[in-house]
């Protein structure tokens, strides 16, 4: 329910949008979002959510979460004239949708493609990094500012969704 999760954009978007911002480090120009409530009346989350992040360089990234679509869409896709990156769901999570890291396929202008290897993580890496930060002051890979900006992008997407997908400029911080 939206009262608990913040809605479909917040529920599913936090990790996906963070992954997108790690792939495209450009400044964000604006965000547009849409929520559709069509079928599942027992829950207050949108049945379908669509977020497009437009960067100042003209690049765009799109995140779609749908509990309606007959075919599962990629987690996200970044399309360009020189190539594209498709972030697909990991089938290891089947039959349910699991928030495993996306399988990244890089598509080149010449029509070739390759799956980008994921960096292996040691078990409990997040917790180890917290201990390292507390005990030794070693910065964590994910910092509060990065997380704060992802939340600001989701807030802008929700605001846009309330205004029929009119683009909204998120309030982001650099430091």
What positions do the PLM features span?
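Predominantly a Rossmann-like dinucleotide-binding segment in NAD(P)-dependent oxidoreductases
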Residues: 1-42, 164
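Active-site rim elements
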Residues: 5-8, 114-118, 136-141
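A generic structural signal for residues located within well-ordered alpha-helices
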Residues: 12-15, 122, 145-149
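A general structural signal for well-ordered alpha-helical segments in protein cores
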Residues: 16-17, 101, 123-131, 154
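Phosphate/oxyanion-binding loops and surfaces in catalytic or ligand/nucleic-acid-binding neighborhoods
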Residues: 23-26, 81-85, 157-161
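NAD(P)-dinucleotide binding in Rossmann-like oxidoreductases
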Residues: 37, 41-46, 56-126, 143, ...
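Short beta-strand scaffold segments in enzyme catalytic cores
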Residues: 51-53
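C-terminal helix-rich "cap/oligomerization" subdomain common to oxidoreductases
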Residues: 56, 131-175
